[in-house]
Every structure is written in C-alpha cells, then in structure tokens.
Amino acid sequence: MARLVAFDMDGTLLMPDHHLGEKTLSTLARLRERDITLTFATGRHALEMQHILGALSLDAYLITGNGTRVHSLEGELLHRDDLPADVAELVLYQQWDTRASMHIFNDDGWFTGKESPALLQVFVYSGFRYQIIDVKKMPLGSVTKICFCGDHDDLTRLQIQLYEALGERAHLCFSATDCLEVLPVGCNKGAALTVRTQHLGLSLRDCMAFGDAMNDREMLGSVGSGFIMGNAMPQLRAELPHLPVIGHCRNQAVSHYLTHWLDYPHLPYSPE
C-alpha cells in the first residue's frame, strides 16, 4: 500500500471553480486516519498553500512553485531552487514577441507589471493576488520562477524564442494550456518529491501521485503509482501512455479513485 500520496492542485484536486469539494476533503481526512502522508505538489505559491492548509486544518507537506520550494508539516523550508540571476535578467528585460502577460515569483509573493484581473478567478478560494511593480526593478537574485499567461498558440511560439535565448540554462514547461513557466534547470515536482521522500526515509515506489499537466510529468512518471486526470493535457497522455487515466476533476475523480482504493484495494477500478 502507498505510504505517501502527492496531489497536483489545479485541474486535479481542485474542481473547475478552483475549490476543494466536500468528498475530496473527506477522502483526505481518511488518508490521514490511515497514517498516509499527504503532499500537495503545485505551481502555486507557498504563502497561498500555507494559508489554505491552515484554513482547512490539513496536515500536509508542500511542494510549491513547481518544485522550487519544499516545506515540512511545520512550515520549515527543506529545499529551495532559484533561477540564476542572469537567466532572470534575460527573461525579464528581453522584448519577446508575445501578447502573453509576464508574472514573477519570489518568497515575498507574486508580481506583475500590469493588471490581469481575469487571472484572479483562479485564486478565489484563497484570495491570493499579485502585486503591481516595475518589472525592471525586480531583485534578480531571488526569483523562483517566471510565468507567461496567454493563448496557447502564442505561448508555443514564445517557447521557441525562450529555448533559442536560454538554451540549457532553464527548464520550460506548460503548467496549463495557457501558462508557460521558466524554472531552474532540473527543477520539477518529481525532483522535489525525491527530496521529500528521502527526508521521510521512503522510496518513490512507496508513493502515489495524481496530475493533469506537463508540469506533473516527472512526478507521475517516477512514483510507484501515477494517475492521469481525464481532463489532462493531451501532451501528458502522449508522454506517459502507460499510466491509467481516471475521471474529470469536476467530478472529484481523485476522491472517487481513492475511496475505491481504501475500501476495495484488491478489486479493479472503473472511473465510471
């Protein structure tokens, strides 16, 4: 039986309205009763996730910023990974041929150069929001990641530009169809989960994980039991064709699967 379960948030554990469903909360409580370690592995900021865990009285480890930070149950920082200052400078100062908005993250929060009110709908659950700044005055030595949000085709073209400019100096991935992220080299949820399991004396084979986007690829591919959401990005399914696909996040599919796993561990599962 798995001893640790890792969850992506958006498109996986959260429903389309960006809330946690009651069935999901009940299932998380059942996992803790079985002494199964919970880990939330998300692109969201540590400050936001710590607020959510506190509001829900949930005990869980945190992998945030798509692996740039790992925190213990008590909020202790166990691992950090930042963009090199020269990479952050290039991405922030270059004039990219894109309509996408740019968003910068460090330990103090989420920063952007102009209002993007539509993006705040994603954070309605927590109330987390950006701070407007002059991007050119952003401290370069503490940037965890930089995101571009916009149309997928536009972001795909931007990805090519970024690859040409950065080469092997950064890791690029789509955390959603409308969000392209620039991360430190080697930084992903799978690498962060390895840090997490080593700290607990566990093997990745002891872990189960759920996800829906390309930023979940390394995590899902490295654990003993990885599951892809029915609403997942097609690219993720293509990258990991051997992994089982469960239902849609709108139906709290993670809870549906885990309830079956807890109650009928020896019977085959159907997402219907």
UniProtKB/Swiss-Prot annotation:
Protein name: HMP-PP phosphatase
Taxonomic superkingdom: Bacteria
Similarity remark: Belongs to the HAD-like hydrolase superfamily. Cof family.
Keyword Nucleotidyltransferase: no
EC number of the protein: 3.6.1.-
Gene Ontology MF term list: 4-amino-5-hydroxymethyl-2-methylpyrimidine diphosphatase activity; magnesium ion binding; phosphatase activity
Annotated keywords: Hydrolase, Magnesium, Metal-binding
Cofactor: Mg(2+)
Active site per database record: D8 (nucleophile)
Encoding gene (name): cof
Function recorded in the entry: Catalyzes the hydrolysis of 4-amino-2-methyl-5-hydroxymethylpyrimidine pyrophosphate (HMP-PP) to 4-amino-2-methyl-5-hydroxymethylpyrimidine phosphate (HMP-P).
Amino acids binding Mg(2+): D8, D10, D212
Reactions listed under catalytic activity: 4-amino-2-methyl-5-(diphosphooxymethyl)pyrimidine + H2O = 4-amino-2-methyl-5-(phosphooxymethyl)pyrimidine + phosphate + H(+)
UniProt keyword Metal-binding, yes or no: yes
